[in-house]
Amino acid sequence: INVALLFDWIKSRPRMEVRWTLHDCWAFTGHCAHFSFVKCEQWKTGCERCTQTKEYPKSWVIDNCKENFRKKRSAFCNVGNMHLITPSEWLAGLVKDSFLKNYPVQVAHNTIDTNIFKPTDSDFRKEHGLEGKTVLLGVASAWSARKGLPDFIRLAQQLDDSYKVVLVGVTKRQIKQIPDDILCIERTDSACELAEIYTSADIFVNL
């Protein structure tokens, strides 16, 4: 999608109502989708010399964040009848500190299917030798330092044998690199299987 052309088209129709759901911070930065991990606050005034060009969305050649910031601010501001929607109060607060602050912001939390994600009987503990253990669970679609993978590794090293750290969503390559004291499970596309894993956990950890 050519974002600039899209917003030019929207602005040419001032009576159009626009509802834009933001799932990350990309809309108001010069490059990155997340900046908290690197403690960057350039997005409040203007991005330049980005330290995350190799992170999603990756840019391998040039750092164009300063120009991207200017283009986004020009494109996204001054839309006549636009409301923003975020899935969390946290993201809504960031929006209100950005160049999008003049738009109304509504929080609509992500929902879950309680017909699937509910206490579910399974043999997960037995199959993985977790009976009698206190299970600490971490789940991610893609594990990285920003998602807290190094912190889970340190946590597992500090716990005694009565605990077991279980990580869901790791890749085959990561499994080879992660210490054996962590139970690693590759990403599953089965919501029912994920519900069984959640039910088997004693503690869910989100870093």
Regions flagged by a language model, labelled:
Residues 93-96, 112-127, 175-178:
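Acidic anion/phosphate-binding donor-loop and adjacent secondary structure
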Residues 1-50:
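Conserved nucleotide-sugar donor-interacting segment of glycosyltransferase catalytic cores
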Residues 130-147, 153-157:
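Conserved donor-binding/catalytic core segment of Leloir-type glycosyltransferases
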Residues 139-142, 153, 164-177:
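Glycosyltransferase donor-sugar binding loop
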Residues 12, 42-84, 98-99, 103-104:
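Membrane-proximal helix-turn-helix segments that form the acceptor-binding/catalytic region
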Residues 104, 130-137, 163-164, 203:
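Charged active-site motifs of nucleotide-sugar-dependent glycosyltransferases
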Residues 169-203:
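Nucleotide-activated donor-binding/catalytic signature segment of Leloir-type glycosyltransferases, i.e.
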